[in-house]
C-alpha cells in the first residue's frame, strides 16, 4: 500500500492596475506588445520601481492565512534563459519572502484538515510565447505583471484534498479582492508536485512536477494519473528508472502526463539579491491598513448559519464562490426571506445554469430573482407558478411582473371565487367530508389538493387552507 504526497505551487496574478516594477497596464486581451516599456523590455539602463499596491495585497493575503508577514523582505534574481523572459532573469523573492508559515483549513469527507503554507512571495510574471506552424512569437504584455506565488507544505494526500485546497485558496483570493483568479486567463495557475511512498514510511521520495493545469477537473485527473504511473513503476521494479525529478505536462485530450524537461534545483537558478532593488521595509501604517480584511468565506458561512438560520450545507454552496456570495447578499439586502433566497438561488437558479453559464453570466440577475421572490412572499404567485416565470425569464429579457401578467399566473385570492370551487369539491366528495368529520384529519390535504387542481394552481394556497378550515 502506498501513500501519496502532494505539494502545490500556485501563481496568482494580483489585480493591480499597473505592473509590479513599472507603470505599464496589466489589462488582459489587448494587442500583443502594446503594454510594454524599457523596463518590461529589459532595455539597458531601465530600473525597476516597486508597486506598493502589490505589497499591500500580499500583506492582506498573509493576514488571511494566519501567516507571518515579514516586515523586511528581499527581492532576488532567478536566472534562466527563455524567449519570454527579456532580462534572462526573473525578479522574485528567495531568501526572505514577504509571507511565510501560514495555514489553511479544508473540509474533505466531513473531516477538517489543516494544510500548511510554507511561503508566499512576490515576483514578476514572464511574457507569453505564441507558437504558430513554423515560428514562435513573443508577447510581452504579461511580462512584469505582479504575481504572488503561494507554496503549500507537502500535506496533501490525494487529489480530492488538492482540489479542496485550491478551491479554498481561490475563494480567499477572490473574497480579499486581490486577484480575479481567472484560470482560463491564466491569473490562477497551479503546478503540482507529486510523489509516493510506502505507507508508514516518513521519507520523501522523488517528486515530479506537473504543469499546464488550468482547471480543477484537470488538476484532479493529472494527479490521479501520475500517482497511478508512479505506483505501477514501483510495483514493476522500474521506479528508479522511470520516476525521476522532472517537469511533466498534462495532455488534456489523452488525460496523461508527458515528460517535458528535467526539473532544476534552486541552486541551478543561481539566486542572488537584486542590486537594483532595496530590501522591502513595510511601514507600520501600511501593515495596519493592509491588515483590515473583508469578511472571508468561513466567517460568512458561520454568520449565515448562526444569524440567518441557514443549513451548513447550503451555506457552503453559497460561499463556494465570491459571485455566489455577492448574489446571495444582494437578495438578503433586498429583504428577501433567507430560506426562500437559498431555495431560489441554490436550487432553482443554479439548477437551470447549463452549458458553461455561471452565476456571474446568468441572464437572471439578483434584482430580477429578488423581484420573483417578492411576488411569492406577497402572494401574487405560487411557488409552482414562480418556476414557470423563472423558466421564461431565463430565455427572455423581460421583467418579472410583465411575465406574470403575460402568462396569466397571478394567484386568485378572491374569497368568492375560491369558495365556489370549495363548495363544488365538498359536494362531489360528501362521503369523504363525513369521514373527515368523524376524525380522519389527513383527508384535509386531499381537499386542498382537489381545490388547487380545480383552480388550475391559480389559487392562493394559504387562502384555500383558511377557507377550507372554516367550511369544514
From Swiss-Prot:
Summarize subunit and interaction data from the UniProt record for this chain: Heterotrimer of A, B and C subunits.
The protein's name: Aspartyl/glutamyl-tRNA(Asn/Gln) amidotransferase subunit B
Tell me which species this is from.
Campylobacter fetus subsp. fetus (strain 82-40)
Q: Which family does the entry's similarity section mention? A: Belongs to the GatB/GatE family. GatB subfamily.
Highest taxon, organism lineage: Bacteria
Task: Say yes or no: keyword Nucleotide-binding present.
Answer: yes
UniProt GO molecular function: asparaginyl-tRNA synthase (glutamine-hydrolyzing) activity; ATP binding; glutaminyl-tRNA synthase (glutamine-hydrolyzing) activity
This molecule's function is given as: Allows the formation of correctly charged Asn-tRNA(Asn) or Gln-tRNA(Gln) through the transamidation of misacylated Asp-tRNA(Asn) or Glu-tRNA(Gln) in organisms which lack either or both of asparaginyl-tRNA or glutaminyl-tRNA synthetases. The reaction takes place in the presence of glutamine and ATP through an activated phospho-Asp-tRNA(Asn) or phospho-Glu-tRNA(Gln).
Amino acid at each position: 500500500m502506498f501513500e501519496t504526497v502532494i505539494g502545490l505551487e500556485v501563481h496568482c496574478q494580483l489585480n493591480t492596475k499597473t505592473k509590479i516594477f513599472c507603470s505599464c497596464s496589466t489589462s488582459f486581451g489587448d494587442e500583443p506588445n502594446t503594454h510594454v516599456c524599457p523596463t518590461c523590455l529589459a532595455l539597458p539602463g531601465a530600473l525597476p520601481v516597486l508597486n506598493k499596491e502589490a505589497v499591500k495585497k500580499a500583506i492582506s493575503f498573509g493576514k488571511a492565512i494566519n501567516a507571518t508577514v515579514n516586515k523586511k523582505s528581499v527581492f532576488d534574481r532567478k536566472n534562466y534563459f527563455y524567449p519570454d523572459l527579456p532580462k534572462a532573469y526573473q525578479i522574485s523573492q528567495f531568501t526572505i519572502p514577504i509571507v511565510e508559515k501560514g495555514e489553511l483549513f479544508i473540509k474533505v469527507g466531513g473531516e477538517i484538515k489543516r494544510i500548511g503554507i510554507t511561503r508566499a512571495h512576490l515576483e514578476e510574471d514572464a511574457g507569453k510565447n505564441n507558437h504558430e506552424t513554423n515560428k514562435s512569437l513573443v508577447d510581452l504584455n504579461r511580462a512584469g505583471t505582479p504575481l504572488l506565488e503561494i507554496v503549500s507544505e507537502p500535506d496533501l494526500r490525494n487529489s480530492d484534498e488538492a482540489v479542496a485546497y485550491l478551491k479554498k485558496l481561490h475563494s480567499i483570493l477572490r473574497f480579499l479582492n486581490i486577484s480575479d483568479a481567472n484560470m482560463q486567463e491564466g491569473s490562477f495557475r497551479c503546478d503540482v508536485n507529486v510523489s509516493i511512498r510506502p505507507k508508514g514510511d516518513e521519507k520523501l521520495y522523488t517528486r515530479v512536477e506537473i504543469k499546464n493545469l488550468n482547471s480543477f477537473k484537470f488538476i484532479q485527473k493529472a494527479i490521479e494519473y501520475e500517482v497511478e504511473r508512479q505506483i505501477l513503476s514501483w510495483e514493476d521494479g522500474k521506479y528508479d528508472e522511470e520516476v525521476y525529478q522532472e517537469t511533466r505536462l498534462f495532455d488534456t485530450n489523452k488525460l496523461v502526463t508527458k515528460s517535458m524537461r528535467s526539473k532544476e534545483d534552486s541552486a541551478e537558478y543561481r539566486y542572488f539579491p537584486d542590486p537594483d532593488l532595496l530590501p522591502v521595509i513595510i511601514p507600520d501604517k501600511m501593515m495596519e491598513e493592509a491588515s483590515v480584511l473583508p469578511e472571508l468565506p468561513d466567517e460568512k458561512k458561520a454568520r449565515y448559519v448562526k444569524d440567518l438560520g441557514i443549513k451548513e450545507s447550503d451555506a457552503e454552496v453559497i460561499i463556494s464562490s465570491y459571485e455566489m456570495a455577492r448574489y446571495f447578499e444582494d437578495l438578503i439586502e433586498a429583504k428577501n426571506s433567507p430560506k426562500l433566497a437559498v431555495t431560489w438561488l441554490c436550487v432553482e437558479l443554479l439548477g437551470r445554469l447549463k452549458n458553461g453559464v455561471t452565476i456571474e453570466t446568468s441572464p437572471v440577475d439578483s434584482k430580477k430573482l429578488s423581484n420573483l421572490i417578492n411576488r411569492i412572499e406577497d402572494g401574487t404567485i405560487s411557488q409552482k407558478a414562480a418556476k414557470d416565470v423563472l423558466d421564461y425569464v431565463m430565455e427572455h429579457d423581460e421583467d418579472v411582473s410583465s411575465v406574470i401578467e403575460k402568462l396569466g399566473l397571478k394567484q386568485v385570492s378572491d374569497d368568492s371565487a375560491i369558495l365556489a370551487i370549495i363548495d363544488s369539491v365538498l359536494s362531489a366528495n360528501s362521503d369523504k367530508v363525513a369521514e373527515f368529520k368523524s376524525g380522519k384529519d389527513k383527508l384535509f390535504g386531499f381537499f386542498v389538493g382537489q381545490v388547487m387542481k380545480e383552480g388550475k394552481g391559480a389559487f392562493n394556497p394559504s387562502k384555500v387552507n383558511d377557507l377550507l378550515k372554516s367550511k369544514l
